[in-house]
Curated annotation (Swiss-Prot):
InterPro entries: Flagellar_FlhD (IPR023559), FlhD_sf (IPR036194). It is found in: Cytoplasm. Keywords: Activator, Bacterial flagellum biogenesis, Cytoplasm, Disulfide bond, DNA-binding, Transcription, Transcription regulation. Belongs to the FlhD family. Functions in complex with FlhC as a master transcriptional regulator that regulates transcription of several flagellar and non-flagellar operons by binding to their promoter region. Activates expression of class 2 flagellar genes, including fliA, which is a flagellum-specific sigma factor that turns on the class 3 genes. Also regulates genes whose products function in a variety of physiological pathways. GO terms for biological process: bacterial-type flagellum assembly; positive regulation of DNA-templated transcription; regulation of bacterial-type flagellum assembly. Pfam families: FlhD. Homodimer; disulfide-linked. Forms a heterohexamer composed of two FlhC and four FlhD subunits. Each FlhC binds a FlhD dimer, forming a heterotrimer, and a hexamer assembles by dimerization of two heterotrimers. This is Flagellar transcriptional regulator FlhD. The keyword Oxidoreductase does not apply. The C-terminal region contains a putative helix-turn-helix (HTH) motif, suggesting that this region may bind DNA.
Amino acid sequence: MKTADSSLLADIREVNLSYLLLAQRMLRDDYAASMFRLGFSNEVADILMRLSPAQLVKLANSSSLLCRFRFDDYSLLSALTQDVLGGALQQAHATILLARQPVEELA
């Protein structure tokens, strides 16, 4: 395996672990708000909350990113990047657009 590939895999694993740890911490602090912010269903949130540190590390060692870029629609991405509506109104618009997205389900 090339050094660049090894470095990329290490970076992916680091991002995965950081994401899983952050998600667990968010869910412990405010379960309902975190489910909304993360786009998780109850089932996904419950499973993530029950994972031990060893299970988190094992899951993080995937060669694929575990987090998903949720801004896959132009109106949402532009609402977050263009200062057309101004501060609070722009943030509210982005929140409404995010709320319309379905939560992730276990397939």
